[in-house]
């Protein structure tokens, strides 16, 4: 019985007007952070694809030791 009383009190607390506004604000911030993080990951993966598809750099110029 104590559990159900605690659950109903908790539900009453979370459905009060101020708390629902607060929870919506926190949820909105979390969604914005998630979208920003996904965009960041997408940009990084696209940058890596461009870098990986570039042709390899030529070997450094070396002077040969034989004189002909």
Curated annotation (Swiss-Prot):
Origin: domain of life: Viruses
Cellular localisation: Host membrane
Keywords for the protein's UniProt record, in alphabetical order: Host membrane, Membrane, Transmembrane, Transmembrane helix
Protein topology in the membrane: Single-pass membrane protein
Parts of the chain that traverse the membrane: 21-41
Any one GO CC term of the record: membrane
Entry similarity comment: Belongs to the asfivirus KP93L family.
Note: Encoded by inverted terminal repeats (ITR).
Protein name from the UniProt record: Uncharacterized membrane protein KP93L
């Amino acid at each position: 019985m104590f559990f159900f009383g605690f659950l109903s009190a908790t539900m009453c607390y979370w459905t009060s007007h101020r708390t629902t506004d607060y929870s919506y604000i926190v949820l909105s911030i979390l969604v914005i952070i998630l979208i920003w993080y996904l965009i960041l990951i997408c940009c990084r993966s696209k940058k890596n694809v461009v870098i990986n598809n570039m042709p390899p750099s030529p070997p450094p110029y070396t002077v040969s030791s034989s004189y002909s």
